[in-house]
C-alpha cells in the first residue's frame, strides 16, 4: 500500500504532533516580518563565519553557502532512544564485519555474503589483511543516513564510513538557533550537541597505539580546495589539535612525525579526511601529493592509528549495504532494530529484469556513487535519461542497485511563498572508541526544491537544526 509522506510536525487533520505542539504554537504567534528578519540574519552570520562548501564543475564559482532553514526537526525522546539503540547495533556489526573480512572471513565462508562481492570490491584493501587495529575498531566515525517512510518507520538509507562529513553544520546550526531564538531553548528541554568535539577527541585518544599514555592527535586534510575544508578546520580548532596536510608529516623508523618549528613531533593518531587512495603514494596512487610516503608501513607496524581505518570503505559500498541486516544477525545474534530500504541488486538477473521493466518507478544508484551524483530518480526523470540509465545498467549491471522511490518524510520549511513541506533525512554521527557514543540528533538535510527527494548540499539541499527532546 502506497503512503503519502509522513509530516514530522503535523497530523493529517492539521493539529501539531504532541512533541511539536509547543513549537507549533510559538511559530503561529510569530509575525512574518520577524521570521523573515531572522532568516536574513542567519544567512548573514553564516556568510560572515564562512560556512561554505566547494562545488566542483561549477563555472559560477566554487564556494557556496549551505542554506539553513530556521524551522527545526524535532524528535521525541522515545523515538531517539530507539534510533540510538539501533544505530549502535548497526555500527557494532559493521565494525565486526570489517575486522572479519581482513582476518578469518567467517561471514564469507558461511556464504552469507558472496566472497567475490567483497574481495573484488574496489574498496577492499588486501594490504589490510591480518592487520590488527586498536580495539578492533575500523569505523571510528560513522554517518548513518536515516529516512522515515510514509508509514512513519525509520529506515537506514546509507552507511557513510569512509570520511563522513556534515557534523560541523550540525554544531553551527545549533549555535545559530540558540542565538536567533533563545526563548525556544528556555521553553523546551533540548539535548545539547556542543560536546561532540570533546567526545570525538576522547574517542580518538582512546584508540591510540598500545602503550601511548598521552597521545598526540592530528587532523589530516587535503587542503583548502577540499569541499569540506571548513569542517576540517572547524573540528581541528574545536578539538585543539593540529590541522595538517600530507607535506607536514613524514615517516621515520616506522613512526610518523609532524614537522614543527621546534623540530619533529611524534604523532599517534591521525583523523584523516582524505580517501584511502591518496594516503600513501608508495602503496596506493603513486601520483598522490596529499598523503604520507611510508604511512602504511607505520600503520601495519602498529605505531600509528588512522581513523577511519584504511579499508573501511568496503563496508559503506552500496553493493554491501543490502547485507547489513544479515551482518547484525551473524555477528550479534540479534534482529535489526532499524531496517534497510528494500534494495534490488542488479548483478542478480531476476533483480535486473524487474528493475529494467520498472525504471520509471524506481531510484537507481551507482554502488560507488556519493553526494547525489550518479543516480536516477525514475519518477522525476525524462525519457532520454531513463533510456541512458537502461543502457548503462545493461552494460555493467554490477555497478548499480535500485530502490523504491520513497515518500521521504516532510517538515515545514521556508520557501519563497512561505512555509511549505519539504522532504528531509537525518544523518546521526556515531563515534566508536572505548564505547559507542552518539550525540543526540544529527544533521537534518532538507530538499529545498518543491517535490525534490535529493537532500545533498551538492545538489541544492539545505540543513535544519535537529532537536531531541529530553522530556
Predicted regions and their residues:
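Preference for protein termini
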Residues: 1-471
